[in-house]
Regions:
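Weak global preference for isoleucine
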Residues: 2, 11-13, 40-43, 210, ...
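Divalent metal-dependent catalytic cores for phosphoryl transfer on phosphate-bearing substrates
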Residues: 3-13, 24, 36-159
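An active-site-proximal "capping" alpha-helix that borders the catalytic cofactor pocket
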Residues: 17-30
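Surface-exposed helix-capping loop/turn segments at secondary-structure junctions
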Residues: 31-35
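Non-catalytic terminal regions of proteins
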Residues: 118-228
């Protein structure tokens, strides 16, 4: 669950919906990844396993706030990662998403996270051994593209429309030596400077709003135009 806090409520966005938004950024990236379909599939479905956790809002009894993906309890989160990898339909996407999940555990000394990381490293080596030359040659590039598109989608989900207040993105985005700055033209129109996209496109992501006492307030769609 992605949680954006407001003075009187919380905006919640399901992880898999955010993942599909990531895929939209990847589809319109001007330098199309190779192999295209398998990479887009991986980026679009990189949070597939979260759909089971996101069926309901889980509350942190200590803070009195909903758990988000940043502080969700470790054991169910790791189970969601494993389930997401099981559900992916092709080995290339599985490898990319495994690399993505394992990167979250870098430097961790938590026993469960270390075990998960090492297990995924072994999985990745097996999958690499079955890849074509094109798949293997572009694997690291496509992994970095997944990370970038993940962050672009999180930027949209974590910030109020028209703002750049979340601390993760104050300095923009970096990708393979290039820097991209997010620029809001208005509350419903976003561009990156310099422009990395092949053409303008639209984004739509469903959201819910809950009051601080947990009562449902509303649901709707965040709609956004990305210009080029």
């Amino acid at each position: 669950m992605i949680v954006r806090e407001r003075p009187d409520s919380y905006i919640i966005i399901r992880q898999h919906d955010h993942g599909q938004l990531s895929g939209r950024f990847a589809v319109y990236w001007a330098e199309s990844p190779r192999p295209f379909e398998r990479t887009i599939y991986a980026i679009t479905n990189h949070d597939l396993g979260w759909q089971f956790l996101d069926r309901s809002v889980r509350w942190d009894e200590t803070s009195g706030k909903p758990y988000s993906f940043t502080n969700y309890p470790t054991d169910p989160k790791l189970r969601a990662y494993k389930e997401g990898l099981r559900l992916l339909r092709n080995p290339y996407a599985t490898c990319l998403c495994s690399m993505h999940y394992a990167s979250f555990m870098q430097g961790s000394e938590d026993a469960a996270e270390v075990q998960f990381r090492e297990m995924e490293f072994r999985r990745q080596e097996k999958l690499k051994g079955r890849m074509s030359a094109e798949e293997l040659e572009n694997l690291e590039h496509n992994f970095r593209l997944l990370q970038l598109c993940d962050n672009l989608s999180l930027f949209v989900c974590l910030n109020e429309p028209g703002s750049n207040e979340h601390p993760w993105y104050k300095n923009g985005f970096s990708f393979e030596g290039k820097k991209f700055e997010p620029v809001w033209e208005d509350r419903g129109t976003l561009r990156l400077d310099p422009n990395p996209f092949s053409r303008p496109f639209d984004l739509t992501v469903p959201y819910g709003a809950i009051q601080r006492d947990g009562r449902f307030r509303e649901s709707g769609y965040l709609e956004l135009r990305v210009t080029s």
